[in-house]
């Protein structure tokens, strides 16, 4: 099957790397997720990845800590995850390059659009750590920003549910799944796709989002080929 997308930006939550517990690194889960990324990469698609940091740090659970400091700790957690995902992919024979939004030359080069594009065009998976480099912005917003910067065709948001619902499907058996959505409806109805900043950035730059379940890592390759594996959000 031909590729529907030539360049994608994939968001993976930090909790996903922690398996059922959602903390630290769960090796079988890491193997499965990175194996799914490898299958997509072997199809010839250019891939960028943003990883969250929730398996190590949740800013909203930081108690009385000052928000800027809490977010900076979260940014460092995403760098740890970026390095871990890079290492796992390299073990599987997939070339990668990590970029950070926070200057730490002993760890990885700082992000620039030119270098990230060069890496992807060479067949490497570009992995972005450090969030946007600024507090008060989510990793969803980071993914949207990097996707726009590298001219990705689409943003893939790999989650723990198989798409977007009108209410929490884990709590409400009658929850309705959307096959497609517009950004306008997402923003007006405050649907749990991503935060408003990220959704607005995607809408304004005509960047579609595909939300799908990472429980089956093969969904990444299926999505690249245009299979219906989740909910497509676009600006109609």
Regions found by a protein language model. Give the residues of each.
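C-terminal catalytic "cap/lid" subdomain
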Residues: 1-236
């Amino acid at each position: 099957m031909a590729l529907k997308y030539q360049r994608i930006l994939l968001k993976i939550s930090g909790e996903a790397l922690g398996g059922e517990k959602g903390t630290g690194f769960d090796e079988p889960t890491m193997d499965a997720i990175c194996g799914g990324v490898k299958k997509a990469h072997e199809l010839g698609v250019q891939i960028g990845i943003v990883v969250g940091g929730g398996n190590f740090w949740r800013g909203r659970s930081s108690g009385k800590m000052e928000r800027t400091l809490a977010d900076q700790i979260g940014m460092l957690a995403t760098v740890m995850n970026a390095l871990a995902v890079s290492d796992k992919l390299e073990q599987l024979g997939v070339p990668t390059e990590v970029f950070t939004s926070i200057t730490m030359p002993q760890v990885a080069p700082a992000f620039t659009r030119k270098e990230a594009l060069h890496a992807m065009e060479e067949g490497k998976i570009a992995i972005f750590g450090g969030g946007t480099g600024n507090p008060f912005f989510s990793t969803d917003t980071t993914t949207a920003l990097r996707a726009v910067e590298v001219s990705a065709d689409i943003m893939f948001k790999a989650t723990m549910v198989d798409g977007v619902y009108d209410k929490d499907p884990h709590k409400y058996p009658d929850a309705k799944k959307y096959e497609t959505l517009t950004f306008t409806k997402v923003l007006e109805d405050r649907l749990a796709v991503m935060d408003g900043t990220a959704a607005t950035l995607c809408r304004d730059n005509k960047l579609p989002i595909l939300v799908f379940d990472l429980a089956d890592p093969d969904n990444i390759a299926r999505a690249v080929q245009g299979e219906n594996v989740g909910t497509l959000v676009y600006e109609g």
